[in-house]
Amino acid sequence: MKNDFAVEASFFKNTLSLTFDYYWGRRYDIFMSASQRNIPPWLGADPVAANIGKTKERGWELEMRYNNSTKFGLKYYATAMFSHGKDEIVYMEDPEFTPAYQKKAGYQIGQQTSYLHSGVITSWDQMYTGAAVENTSGNNVGMLQLIDYNGDGVIDTNDIVPYGYPNRPQYTMNFTVGAAWKGISLSVQFYGTRNCTLVRSAGEFSSPHYYTVLDTSIMGDMWLPGSQEGGTYHHPVYKGSGASVHSGSFNMVDGTQWRIKNAELAYTLTAERLRKAGITSLRFYISGNNLWLFSHLNEDRETGGTRTNDNVMKYPLTKRYTFGVKIEF
């Protein structure tokens, strides 16, 4: 069941218009596969798929447009679009004795989770006097000191907690501005997202370098005895050592981004001599995509919360410039 409330309005002889939508709803009988079910072992039967999941959602969308012109023939416009959406799991058959912070219910779909950490282990004393790590493979001076969240004296999966947001943004923003005067036109589009958490990785290029190539921004901030003891990233380790489980929340990164998505400058000719040649208009333009980016990531990424085998560092979003001529007959 989904509900929607909308308002549309215009002002100043339609030069300014806005549209606002607020929606909310609940979903019932969501399919859960057998692997997602949590059936106690004493039941003596394997779980079966069932339509028992429940979620709720709410959000809003706002769009504003402004168009105007001057007595000198300058036309200009601006468009702004904002959206916010948030969902929540109401029921997903969480085990009865699971700690509240590890249950799915009450959190968003796709909520990121992680160990927490308190910095780099800089001495043997610090390592041995801290909470014991259940899997000590790769645990060493120079690694990250994980936090014993539930206070039982052992670092294990019970210390994994919700962290940040899901890997999809709660807020998206889109701004477009433009102007035209005597055949010259200019437009610029800005795009941004907020409230999402992404997972970064220090290892680049799974093939053919086999995770041996590291990002320079990470290398410059690694903890190294005697040379970079002020570093905040754990020392480099071989991927197969198992040390990746001790990265804690360090690799959880604020996914906020702002970018100039595209821009275009154009000039259109409609002179009488063009018409004599059978040409209605002649347009010259230069445009660019992905011209500027602000991000907490050390890469240009718009999809996914983590990397896949087709590592995004191999094919990042690229800047692209285009020059063209458009002829209309």
Region spans (language model):
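Surface-exposed loop/turn segments flanking beta-strands in extracellular/periplasmic regions
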Residues: 37-47, 99-112, 116, 139, ...
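Extracytoplasmic gating/loop element in the C-terminal half of outer-membrane beta-barrel translocons
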Residues: 193-283, 288
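Outer-membrane beta-barrel and related beta-rich outer-membrane complex signature
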Residues: 28-35, 74-76, 87-103, 195-222, ...
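C-terminal beta-signal and terminal closure region of outer-membrane beta-barrel proteins
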Residues: 49-57, 100-126, 224-229, 243-245, ...
